């Protein structure tokens, strides 16, 4: 199952089930010193959402490929570079007809989904002159030239697209967090402008008080340090801190027993530290900031420990990290409340962008209002013309009656009264 771990861990899917043929590595610990250790029931663990717009397609393709014995055996021996380079994609030519048929169907469904997205985009832009094929080429995780067949090119493109997109995923999350904080500050300042001086001072005072309350928390251990891991060992694992053993710790927290600590398994180690700073019940604690803090901690530990940069921590890498001086005597960890997310210049630039966007929206709203008013004017004009027409018809009918001429029917034919 190592191929699946490598591929999906690298792509952040982190599928945590093993092939039934593989057995978990036994954990060598003194059972007399372990408290409250309960056997974990076997269960299918759903892979987390990668955040990619083709996440479901990626998962389905991997699930189908896993059912082919030949392909699975080839990939069990693969390393990350072989998977990333696309050399293994050629093995797709040897999978069973049944598997290829399923992959073909998945691709047709994905192409159909993308075309629906494009249609929705075109409808929203009302740009009939836009080239559909050019839009389709924006999606680089499949081969558009053959929309009905899943080929080795498709697998190669899917792996490379996921690898590239997810390598930039953390950076994108940091940028989105920064925008979130700037928007928060922008909205706070805009709200203050609506208040009188007395109310404004009250709000400013409350804001400063909330900041102080949030900053008043226990010391946060440096992520990945001995103190931090020992705290997890004692409080989460229920073990004696004097018996702390890095090798045992690694095996305890390698939840799926695949020989690696993946990003989700690492992030789980920081929960106790984050709970010192963030409480969802407290008004002053922002849970969005907590997730940013978790991401920063994980990135820091990965940079320090993951020497081959494959986004996975092996037991060897983990043990080497525990031999470093920084493991025993780390620098103090600066939490987000000790940092400035943006400068005044950056906030000003962001507010200018918001103002431009608001102006564009206002222009569109004004245009729509004008169109609505014009349509209403035309409607009223048509109604007036209809009324005038009916009045003229009625006057003509009355005049004919006065002259003794039979009234005409809807088609202009004369109506005669039957003689009895």
Swiss-Prot record:
Keyword entries, A-Z: Calcium, Cleavage on pair of basic residues, Cytoplasm, DNA-binding, Endoplasmic reticulum, Golgi apparatus, Guanine-nucleotide releasing factor, Membrane, Metal-binding, Nucleus, Phosphoprotein, Repeat, Secreted, Signal
Positions of the DNA-binding region: 171-223
Domain EF-hand: 241-276, 293-328
Tissues showing expression: Predominantly expressed in spleen, testis and normal stomach.
GO biological process, one term: small GTPase-mediated signal transduction
Residue numbers covered by motif GBA: 304-334
Membrane-protein topology: Peripheral membrane protein
Annotated spans, Disordered: 195-225, 398-420
Amino acids binding Ca(2+) 2: 306, 308, 310, 317
Intrachain disulfide bonds: none
SMART domains referenced in this protein's UniProt entry, alphabetically: EFh (SM00054)
Other remarks in the entry: NEFA stands for N=DNA-binding; EF=EF-hand; A=Acidic region.
Descriptive protein name: Nucleobindin-2
Organism: Homo sapiens
Species lineage: Eukaryota, Metazoa, Chordata, Craniata, Vertebrata
